[in-house]
Design a protein with these regions (language model features):
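Glycine-rich flavin
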Residues: 1-101, 106-108
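C-terminal helix-coil-helix/basic helical segment that borders enzyme active sites and/or dimer interfaces
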Residues: 14, 215-269
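Predominant activation on well-ordered alpha-helical scaffold segments within soluble catalytic domains
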Residues: 24-28, 48, 196-204, 247, ...
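Buried hydrophobic positions in well-ordered alpha/beta secondary-structure cores of metabolic enzymes
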Residues: 26, 100-102, 161, 199, ...
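A generic structural signal for well-ordered coil/turn residues at beta-strand boundaries
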Residues: 72, 85, 112-114, 125, ...
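DPxDG-like acidic metal-binding loop motif
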Residues: 103-135
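Glycine-rich beta->alpha junctions and the first turn(s) of the following alpha-helix
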Residues: 143-223
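Glycine-rich phosphate/cofactor-binding loops in nucleotide/flavin-utilizing enzymes
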Residues: 264-302
Length: 302
């Protein structure tokens, strides 16, 4: 993280944000080099992006400089909003702000990040707010780091909120839940550059392979769809299929690398097994029902 900060990469989304083509290239390079470093780093940008859009004008002055210089690492907790059933984390209005209760099942960078952007349901709305976790508070309780098949160094925990007090001054936004869902459907349908980065890393290690041309074609088609600026249901479905194709390609490229490497690939010090585990992780990261179905359909054809 210190090296990425020194390179200016903690400020990638500081207004004016870097061009989308540059962002994608950086994502691909970092994901191919080390998936867990990429994952911790990419979540850091969520608070920066949300601060840039927040109507709470006092918040950027408090946090943007430290986040964008890397003096403070950011994290995020909101994926549970996609889950059906009762809300995992709930906001209750109180005098001067909100009371937060519930459990976030996956919170990355615990012990590394100091500032988290968190979401909580409030009936048909979502409250997004910032939590500075330093110093510790009794109303936040983290589990021991979860043991994971991939991204094990990400220090991912379950985080319990027990009457956490969030003042209005720390609120980023309050939006309708269906509005957030519509925005999230589009965001999770877009191509994942990390999948292309993993595929590219595997292809470099493989050498001459037809997968290289397939990667070029898949990347070009996926990014063209994402840049088309169309939001109708048909285009959204095409985006989801393209994302699934990219995920499938990453898994196949990593499997090919393991196969070509042979028994040495089973050593934990060999990149082939790591790339395969990371490719598997990205097949479920930010997964929606539509993406799950599209990915399963794509895998059945491969």
């Amino acid at each position: 993280m210190e090296a990425l900060a020194a390179a200016g990469l903690m400020a990638l989304y500081r207004p004016p944000a870097a061009p989308v083509a540059v962002v994608r290239e950086v994502f691909e390079i970092l994901a191919g080099a080390c998936g867990v470093t990429f994952f911790v780093w990419v979540q850091h940008h969520a608070p920066v992006r949300m601060l840039a859009r927040s109507a709470n004008e006092s918040l950027p002055a408090r946090y943007v400089e430290n986040l964008c210089t890397g003096r403070m690492l950011g994290g995020v907790a909101f994926a549970y909003l996609r889950r059906p059933g009762p809300p995992a984390v709930v906001a209750t209005p109180v005098a001067g702000g909100y009371r937060i209760d519930g459990e976030a099942p996956w919170v990355t960078s615990w012990g590394l990040a100091a500032l988290y952007a968190v979401a909580a349901r409030m009936e048909d709305r979502v409250v997004f707010f910032l939590v500075d976790v330093e110093p510790p508070t009794p109303s936040l309780r983290a589990s021991p780091p979860l043991r994971l098949a991939a991204m094990n160094a990400s220090s991912t925990v379950r985080l319990s909120f027990d009457g956490l007090s969030v003042p209005e001054a720390d609120v980023l936004s309050v939006v309708a839940f269906d509005e957030w869902q519509a925005e999230d459907r589009m965001a999770t349908a877009k191509p994942n550059p990390a999948a292309f980065g993993i595929a590219a890393a595997c292809i470099r290690l493989l050498g001459d392979t037809p997968l290289a041309a397939e990667l070029d074609d898949c990347r070009a088609r996926s990014y063209a769809l994402a840049d088309a600026g169309v939001t109708d249901d048909g285009h959204l479905a095409a985006l989801v299929r393209a994302r699934a194709q990219g995920l499938d390609l990453a898994v196949r490229a990593a499997t090919a690398l393991v196969t070509a490497t042979g028994g040495r690939a089973m050593g934990l010090d060999h990149p082939a097994q790591r790339l395969l585990r990371e490719a598997a992780f990205f097949t479920i990261q930010a997964q929606t029902p539509a993406l799950r179905h599209a990915t399963l359909a794509q895998l059945s054809r491969s």
